[in-house]
């Protein structure tokens, strides 16, 4: 469990969900049409941002670029999935960091859905009723589809990312661009939550595309405590210039 009272943390950490993807749009269409399968021309890892997602990424990048020089991000880390990397690239260009300044880390990838990949919720119930029943019984935190991951599996790989942040990024200002489940699993780790608490957060609302969950040190008596400062924050630039979307994060399977 992280010791949040210690100062061996980044000065600021922003965990960002990518902009709306073409997969989000395809999933919405499939669910609306009652289809069992989501019609996608790319594998999940190669699914790009939608046109709206590109505008969202640009608005988020403008928000980061508006910071004072001593408050701007110094390091960028990204999921290797195209939609996340495109979002991170927009930030990099606005901060004059350059694309080669993005650290791509496979541990930040989307949760893997295995055999349920590309199926809608209706499709899973129709094609894999036993798995749908098992998920309902076990709960999404522990349920692992064949060939896929549970939330616990995702948390396990993120634990080592947290250790890297504490070892290599003390005093830095770090942006991580990833996926909805990744945002929530970081919250589980960094806020020392349990299954019930994180699932209540997840149930309350989806993480908006290009929203920011921010951690850092406070002031006064709170100056040595690394803690959550705001969650699922939608920057005013995004709210003003692009539609805010809260689509389910994955183009395949239940999140």
What are these regions (language model features)?
Residues 85, 99, 159-225:
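Active-site-adjacent alpha-helix immediately C-terminal to a catalytic or transition-state-stabilizing loop
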Residues 22-25, 83-87, 111-114, 183-186, ...:
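Short catalytic/ligand-binding loop motif for oxyanion handling, primarily in non-cytosolic enzymes
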Residues 120-132, 218-236:
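A polyampholytic, Gly/Pro-enriched intrinsically disordered region
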Residues 2-10, 14, 55-133, 196, ...:
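Phosphate-coordination/substrate-recognition cap region in phosphate-metabolizing enzymes
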Residues 12-16, 77, 172-178:
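Beta-strand elements within well-structured catalytic alpha/beta cores of enzymes
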Residues 39-48, 132-152:
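Short glycine/proline- and acidic residue-enriched helix-loop micro-motifs
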Residues 144-167:
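Internal catalytic-core helix/loop-beta-alpha segment
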Residues 1-74, 89-97, 222-255:
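An N-terminal RHG(E/S)-centered segment typical of histidine phosphatases
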């Amino acid at each position: 469990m992280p010791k949040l009272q210690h100062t061996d943390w980044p000065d600021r950490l922003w965990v960002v969900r990518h902009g709306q993807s073409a997969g989000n749009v395809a999933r919405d269409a499939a669910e609306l049409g009652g289809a069992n399968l989501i019609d996608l021309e790319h594998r999940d890892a190669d699914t790009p941002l939608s046109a709206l997602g590109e505008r969202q990424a640009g608005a988020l990048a403008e928000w980061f670029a508006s910071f004072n020089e001593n408050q701007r991000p110094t390091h960028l880390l990204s999921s290797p999935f195209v939609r996340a990397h495109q979002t991170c690239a927009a930030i990099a260009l606005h901060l004059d960091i350059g694309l080669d300044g993005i650290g791509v880390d496979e541990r930040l990838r989307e949760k893997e859905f295995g055999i349920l990949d590309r199926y809608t919720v209706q499709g899973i119930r129709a094609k894999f009723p036993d798995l749908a029943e098992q998920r309902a019984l076990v709960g999404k935190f522990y349920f692992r589809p064949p060939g896929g991951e549970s939330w616990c599996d995702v948390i396990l790989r993120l634990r080592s990312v947290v250790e890297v942040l504490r070892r290599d990024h003390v005093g830095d200002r770090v942006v991580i661009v990833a996926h909805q489940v990744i945002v929530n699993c970081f919250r589980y780790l960094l806020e020392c939550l349990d299954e019930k608490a994180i699932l209540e957060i997840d149930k309350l609302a989806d993480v908006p595309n290009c929203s920011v969950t921010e951690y850092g040190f406070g002031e006064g008596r709170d100056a040595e405590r690394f803690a959550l400062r705001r969650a699922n924050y939608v920057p005013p630039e995004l709210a003003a210039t692009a539609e805010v979307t809260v689509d389910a994060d994955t183009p395949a399977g239940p999140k």
